[in-house]
Amino acid sequence: MNKLNATIVDYQQEDHLLQVRVSLAHTIWHVLLIDSASARKLLEPGREVHVLFKESAIALSKDEHIEMGIQNKLTCKTRQVNRGELLCQIILEQESHAITAIVPTAMVDAFMIVPGQRLTAWIRANELILES
């Protein structure tokens, strides 16, 4: 599980859905949550939180400027590639953050991913969890 530090910016509510904006690594990320009284208690602007997401929730691209229907992204440097027959574990660095992605080996081969290469990690808003 990846865990990054973030700060609550604000949130919007529609019915039982909350869209929370957090500041993370000099960008604004969007997190979708199911509304609850306990969730709203955590959403005070300026509050420090952790954003969590699974290694398998990351999509990777070689170009950060491609049009994609995913709002949250981090441009990273590849630190390490651990190959398996079907899946690879890729360790990425973004400033002081280390992020782990699990992706198909075929994708790693197609992208020719090697340590030192720049990649963009994309994470959907509904794949994120907030932790206080």
Regions found by a protein language model. Give the residues of each.
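Short, conserved beta-turn/loop elements at beta-strand boundaries and strand-helix junctions
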Residues: 11-17, 81-87
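Residue-level structural signal for beta-strand termini and adjacent loop
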Residues: 14, 34-35, 84, 105
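Short, acidic/hydrophobic/Gly-rich beta-strand patch recurrent on exposed beta strands
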Residues: 19-25, 32-33, 89-95, 102
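Hydrophobic transmembrane alpha-helix bundles
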Residues: 90-104, 123-130
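A generic beta-sheet turn/junction motif
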Residues: 15, 24-26, 53, 85, ...
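Glycine/charge-rich catalytic "coupling/switch" loops of P-loop NTPases
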Residues: 2-5, 10, 28, 36-80, ...
